[in-house]
Design a protein with these regions (language model features):
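Glycine-rich beta-alpha junction loops
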Residues: 12, 30, 134, 158-163, ...
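Gly/Ser-rich oxyanion-binding loop with an adjacent helix/lid
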Residues: 64-145
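Solvent-exposed alpha-helices and their adjacent loops that cap or buttress functional pockets
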Residues: 2, 14-16, 25-28, 79, ...
Length: 282
């Protein structure tokens, strides 16, 4: 099958979900698309990317040949997994170029693709969610999809400011107290249980964190205000998405518009759902 006949669509992601630092991720219904450039032709709204783009680096590192284009609605540097989605798209596009355009072949290779994407990204939470879809738990090279008994709306409050994940991570402590570690382990377990049983009453306490969120919010007063505003509504829960500055809010679809109206006007609000498909070849 010719290169011109396929492209890859990959969802954005929200990492950590509060306590699940570097382990939990959620795929979201805003997407990045990538495909090979053939005869210099790219689709409307797309752009050819240079060798420094994370998607191009991933494509070449996995054996892809030629140039690639990208078309994306995922905000960059906002905590919605743009770089992770680009890296997943790059390795999946290279795999399709080498092994054929088949989602069955893609599914069979997901563990290897996860490993390649994680090596490039440095942590698995975003890339696992973007590759597999749904809510994912990943560690030690393995990933599982968390069964969901909920069909929530996810509001993403997205300000104009950007955050460098690398710089944000350097601000975090290299050691933890035993009590903080125990709280986060317990909350992560509680969160997985609440999502899989549909017990929304547990979600607020289950998304509380003691490892990274307060440290990051101390340098992001706008995000802190958005998180506080979200938690003053009847939203089920809210968390700092990845390293921020985006704040993710989980709620019932029927409450989404009312909750969105109460978030600070210093950011845009995207009304999203959980993407259940992950990376797909089209």
């Amino acid at each position: 099958m010719s290169q011109a006949s396929f492209f890859v669509r990959v969802p954005a992601s929200s990492a950590n979900l509060g306590p699940g630092f570097d382990a939990l991720g959620m795929a979201l219904s805003v997407h990045l698309e990538m495909g090979p450039v053939v005869n210099g032709v790219i689709p409307a709204g797309a752009k050819m990317i240079d060798e420094y783009h994370p998607g191009h680096i991933a494509f070449r590192s996995y054996g892809g040949v030629g140039d690639v284009w990208v078309r994306s609605k995922i905000p960059m540097g906002r905590g919605l997994g743009f770089s992770g989605a680009a890296r997943v798209a790059g390795v999946v596009a290279a795999h399709a170029q080498k092994h054929g355009v088949s989602n069955d072949a893609l599914n069979a290779a997901r563990k290897d693709l996860l490993h390649a994407s994680t090596q490039l990204e440095g942590h698995p939470d975003n890339v696992a969610a973007s590759l597999v879809g749904g809510v994912t738990a990943s560690a030690s090279g393995e990933v599982v999809r968390v069964p969901l008994a909920l069909d929530p709306t996810i509001l993403a409050w997205v300000p104009d400011t950007q955050t460098s994940t690398e710089k944000s991570r350097t601000a975090l402590s290299s050691t933890l107290s035993l009590s903080d570690a125990v709280v986060n382990i317990g909350h992560t377990a509680l969160l997985l249980g609440a999502l899989s049983t549909g017990d929304v009453a547990l979600l607020r306490i289950a998304t509380q964190d003691r490892i990274h969120q307060d440290i990051r919010l101390a340098n992001a007063p706008g995000s802190k205000a958005a998180l506080d505003a979200a938690l003053s509504t009847n939203a089920w829960c809210a968390w700092l998405s990845g390293s921020g500055p985006t704040v993710a809010v989980m709620c019932a679809k029927s409450d989404a518009k009312q909750i969105a109206s109460q978030l600070p006007q210093t950011g845009d609000v995207l009304e999203l759902t959980i993407d259940q498909h992950g990376a797909v070849i089209i």
